[in-house]
Amino acid sequence: RSWFSFLGEAYDGARDMWRAYSDMKEANYKNSDKYFHARGNYDAAQRGPGGVWAAEVISDARENIQKLLGHGAEDT
């Protein structure tokens, strides 16, 4: 696998995560964030190693932001 293919997978994986986030905002259902986050992770991971990496980075950032804002572990 080439470095460029990894970067392409990561970019597409990040787009998958963004699409899930946008869909969550549009749906506007209470307590639906875990579903949409899981869907984004799954879609990104299907892209390959780059997508898995992007999903992990974005998920870790989400958890760290929630900790910083004082949300408990039940929200992650």
Curated annotation (Swiss-Prot):
<comment type="similarity">
    <text>Belongs to the SAA family.</text>
</comment>
<dbReference type="GO" id="GO:0034364">
    <property type="term" value="C:high-density lipoprotein particle"/>
</dbReference>
<protein>
    <recommendedName>
        <fullName>Amyloid protein A</fullName>
    </recommendedName>
</protein>
<dbReference type="InterPro" id="IPR000096">
    <property type="entry name" value="Serum_amyloid_A"/>
</dbReference>
<keyword id="KW-0011">Acute phase</keyword>
<dbReference type="Pfam" id="PF00277">
    <property type="entry name" value="SAA"/>
</dbReference>
<dbReference type="InterPro" id="IPR052464">
    <property type="entry name" value="Synovial_Prolif_Regulator"/>
</dbReference>
<keyword id="KW-0964">Secreted</keyword>
<dbReference type="GO" id="GO:0006953">
    <property type="term" value="P:acute-phase response"/>
</dbReference>
<keyword id="KW-0345">HDL</keyword>
<keyword id="KW-0034">Amyloid</keyword>
<comment type="function">
    <text>Major acute phase reactant. Apolipoprotein of the HDL complex.</text>
</comment>
